[in-house]
């Protein structure tokens, strides 16, 4: 325990400040460095790999110390915050040269992963979200804010899966929550590990209903929350209030740039769950977690950071209302038709800086003079963009053409006040233009004249002393001085007062030089102080126009997104899809947008698609692995998603029925973090799809049942097809790829099921994948041929052929045909039952063994109380028991 009374005054203040922020690393400003002491120094030196030293502190031993230069704060800060630390910044609040006694210092902000605002470390193409989650009475209130841009949203969901979908959509850097959230049953370890997010449960004072309502009403200056559209979000209000209070306390700012809060329902947009976002690789690839190879990579030709963020949001939240989709399409189409104007707009967009984050820094009072110059250079482009947009007639482009406020008053203010090439710091002068302020001009004149006086004094003393190398110089420690080289030091007059001795020279002052120094330094100090005040005044005037600036920034972002979609459409030969409410998806010569771009020209094989809610609602797609089934299915899902975000699509023609949700079950992978096997992950995702899909959903299911035995897998796949294709149970449009070619027997026996396969050309024992989807089912899997293509040794291939002949699956196929006939008879002579009346034995492979002890044990299992490991052990035991029985019966 440190005895504070023994510490020096500065170290006592450090420890008192640290006591106020015990959960933070304290960056304590000392001159040109931010220093850390004691335990913080040990932590930071280890985490950032910087040198650990010591400092006399009044104790018998030196205090451990490390530090970082003030001008490099952001990079060190970001690295520490990325490791999960909170950092409190204690700044000098007065000039140390003018301080009487201990320099006044105080914490000006606390930096956490979700409250970083520095443009030097944030990815300009992504939002940096802070998310607040409140769990109360079975409801999750969710509030999401990006304090660097001012975005602020709120919603509510009532299930863990919907919660995870929202977290996946926004990818927050930090989550704050109430203690009840930890008790809600959500797997916190999975949440932290899967999304790499810092989660903190805050004190209950953040979540008082009345205090949360009050802080929102006070911030947005309203008498009731009804005016903000929040009346239906009781739990969401608490989440939003907690987020606002947290930002107030960490940033110690009025948050003037957070001007609106947007309530939304998850039903306003197409629902894309976590698995689908991952499988379709919308904004990052599954393996490398990078942008290249994603839909965002294909569509992003934006010129501004604001546009890049908005495009990402559009991909994450496709529309479900036909009129809104068509408005976006018309904007893209008009830009396509006016190629020259579009290219001109893109040229003017290119120099525009990130206005949203600039106004955020201006509101936080952290913007420097160069930020204002960047702001002005951006505003210079607005009149040109506005003029060109005046030529367009489509509703959204015409609206965007009216909205951008050129902000000429701000443009003029910055031009009048700030020099063209200012310094990056605000307290060293050189910021304000001549003519902007009379007092500054006077001080600047005195400073300039002082320089002339110094030049005259130098010339006069050179002549008077005969010292040819005599120079008047300056540094911050000694001020102004005469410097004389050693070869002339014998000629220095007696009235010269020595100030410093160097290796090759000596430094002196005189009474006359001291007088000039007082005049010049006085003028310089006053000028630096005045320029700082004037700069802050200009910055505050700009900050007062935050609403105008944000509206303009959002308009520019919208224009940028439409131009980006138009550029991609024309370069990649995309077409404008028709949008219908009839549930029909018809695509002629559709192409996968990402795969096409990564292949050489004309190498991609286009394919047709037809799905509806009637006779063509489920396509069973068979064919060998590597033939292109997964690519084709993802292609259809991406084309639908692109159409609903308002983009043109890679096809010759397309008519897209609006889908409320897209679900995918593609690929196989163990979820080791949560102890789930490949098969358990697969079945969990299938269960989610069957429970949450609707008639208007699009389902993409790849190789259902592959993670278990052939009989079980085929049984499950068969039953899933029956359930989905039954219009009274679900009836969703579905692409169902499978290696169970026995499932092709379902066409003609189950309404709405159609067979398709990947065309294959056989050349002796070899095969060629034609990548073409054709009607009909594959009668074999070509697994051995695929193994040969993959380079499996010839000896293994030969042995596989021998075994395949011995293990002919004709019996399975024959049994499948029998079941298909039973199914056909049942559907012809029996009304389709309600879900709770479905006969569990219908179409069972084991329909003759209802009294079997294995069946009875399966029926008695309490699945809801079993862990994944228990379930797998039970399945293994029952499977072993069944295999032993088969051996006994021959």
Features from the language model and the residues they span:
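ATPase nucleotide-binding head domains, primarily ABC-like/P-loop NTPase cores
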Residues: 38-41, 233, 303-304, 314, ...
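Conserved catalytic alpha/beta cores of large enzymes that bind or transform nucleotide phosphates
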Residues: 167, 172-180, 186-189, 201, ...
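Amphipathic alpha-helical coiled-coil segments
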Residues: 325, 332, 342-348, 375, ...
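C-terminal tails and terminal domains of large nucleic-acid-associated
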Residues: 844-890
């Amino acid at each position: 325990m440190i005895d504070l009374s023994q510490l020096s005054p500065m170290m006592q203040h450090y420890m008192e400040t640290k006591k106020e922020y015990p959960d933070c690393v304290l960056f304590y400003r000392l001159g040109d460095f931010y220093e850390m002491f004691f335990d913080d120094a040990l932590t930071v030196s280890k985490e950032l790999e910087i040198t650990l030293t010591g400092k006399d502190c009044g104790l018998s031993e030196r205090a451990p110390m490390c530090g970082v230069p003030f001008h490099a704060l952001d990079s060190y800060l970001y690295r520490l915050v990325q490791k999960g630390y909170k950092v409190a910044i204690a700044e000098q609040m007065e000039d140390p040269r003018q301080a009487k006694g201990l320099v006044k210092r105080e914490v000006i902000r606390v930096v956490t992963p979700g409250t970083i605002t520095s443009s030097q470390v944030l990815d300009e193409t992504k939002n940096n979200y802070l998310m607040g989650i409140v769990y109360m009475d079975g409801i999750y209130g969710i509030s999401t804010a990006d304090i660097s841009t001012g975005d602020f949203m709120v919603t509510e969901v009532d299930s863990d899966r919907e919660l995870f979908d929202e977290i996946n959509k926004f990818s927050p850097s930090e989550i704050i929550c109430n203690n009840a959230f930890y008790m809600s049953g959500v797997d916190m370890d999975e949440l932290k590990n899967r999304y790499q997010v810092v989660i903190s449960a805050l004190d209950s004072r953040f979540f008082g209903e009345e205090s949360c309502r009050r802080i929102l009403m006070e911030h947005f200056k309203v008498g009731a929350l009804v005016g903000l559209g929040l009346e239906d979000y009781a739990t969401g209000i608490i989440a939003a209030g907690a987020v606002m209070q947290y930002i107030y306390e960490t940033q110690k700012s009025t948050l003037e740039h957070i001007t609106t809060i947007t309530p939304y329902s998850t039903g306003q947009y197409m629902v894309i769950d976590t698995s689908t976002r991952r499988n379709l690789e919308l904004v990052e690839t599954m393996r490398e977690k990078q942008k290249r190879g994603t839909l965002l990579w294909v569509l992003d030709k934006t010129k501004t950071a604001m546009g890049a963020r908005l495009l990402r949001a559009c991909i994450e939240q496709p529309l479900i209302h036909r009129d809104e989709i068509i408005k976006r399409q018309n904007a893209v189409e008009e830009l396509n038709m006016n190629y020259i104007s579009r290219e001109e707009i893109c040229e003017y967009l290119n120099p525009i800086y990130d206005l949203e984050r600039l106004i955020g820094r201006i509101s936080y009072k952290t913007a420097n003079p160069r930020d204002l110059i960047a702001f002005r250079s951006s505003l210079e482009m607005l009149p040109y963009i506005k003029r060109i947009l005046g030529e367009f007639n489509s509703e959204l482009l015409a609206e965007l053409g009216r909205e951008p406020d050129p902000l000429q008053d701000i443009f003029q203010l910055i031009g009048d006040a700030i020099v063209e090439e200012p310094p990056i710091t605000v307290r060293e002068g050189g910021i304000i233009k001549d003519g902007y302020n009379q007092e500054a001009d006077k001080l600047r004149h005195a400073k300039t004249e002082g320089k002339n006086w110094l030049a005259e004094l130098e010339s006069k003393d050179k002549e008077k002393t005969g010292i040819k190398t005599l120079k008047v110089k300056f540094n911050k420690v000694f001020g102004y001085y005469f410097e004389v080289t050693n070869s002339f030091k014998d000629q220095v007059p007696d009235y010269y007062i020595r100030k410093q001795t160097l290796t090759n020279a000596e430094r002196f002052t005189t009474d006359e030089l001291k007088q000039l120094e007082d005049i010049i330094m006085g003028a310089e100090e006053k000028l630096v102080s005045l320029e700082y005040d004037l700069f802050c005044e200009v910055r505050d005037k700009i900050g007062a126009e935050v609403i105008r600036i944000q509206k303009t920034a959002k308009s520019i972002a919208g224009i940028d997104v439409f131009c980006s979609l138009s550029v991609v459409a024309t370069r990649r030969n995309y077409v404008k899809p028709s949008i219908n409410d009839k549930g029909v998806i018809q695509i002629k010569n559709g192409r996968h947008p990402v795969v096409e771009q990564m292949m050489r020209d004309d190498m991609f094989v286009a394919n047709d698609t037809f799905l509806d809610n009637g006779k063509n609602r489920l396509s069973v797609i068979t064919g060998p692995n590597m033939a292109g089934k997964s690519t084709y299915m993802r292609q259809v899902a991406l084309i639908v998603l692109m159409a609903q975000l308002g983009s043109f699509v890679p096809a010759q023609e397309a008519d897209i029925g609006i889908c409320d949700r897209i679900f995918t079950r593609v690929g196989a992978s163990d979820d080791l973090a949560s102890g789930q096997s490949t098969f358990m992950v697969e079945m969990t995702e299938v269960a989610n799809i069957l429970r949450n899909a609707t008639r208007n959903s699009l389902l993409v299911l790849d190789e259902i049942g592959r993670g278990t035995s052939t009989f079980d897998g085929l049984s499950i796949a068969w039953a899933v097809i029956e359930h989905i294709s039954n219009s009274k149970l679900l009836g969703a449009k579905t692409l169902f790829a499978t290696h169970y070619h026995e499932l092709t027997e379902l066409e003609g026996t189950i309404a709405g099921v159609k067979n398709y396969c990947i065309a294959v050309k056989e050349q002796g024992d070899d095969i060629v994948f034609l990548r073409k989807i054709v009607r009909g089912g594959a009668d074999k899997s070509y697994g051995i041929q695929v193994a040969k293509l993959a380079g499996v040794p010839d000896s293994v291939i030969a042995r596989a052929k021998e075994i395949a002949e011995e293990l002919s699956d004709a019996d399975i196929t024959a049994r499948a045909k029998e079941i298909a006939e039973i199914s056909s008879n049942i559907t012809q002579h029996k009304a389709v039952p309600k879900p709770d009346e479905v006969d569990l034995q219908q179409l069972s492979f084991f329909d003759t063994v209802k009294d079997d002890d294995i069946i009875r044990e399966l029926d008695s299992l309490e699945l809801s109380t079993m862990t994944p490991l228990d379930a797998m052990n039970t399945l293994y035991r029952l499977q072993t028991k069944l295999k032993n029985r088969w051996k006994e019966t021959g």
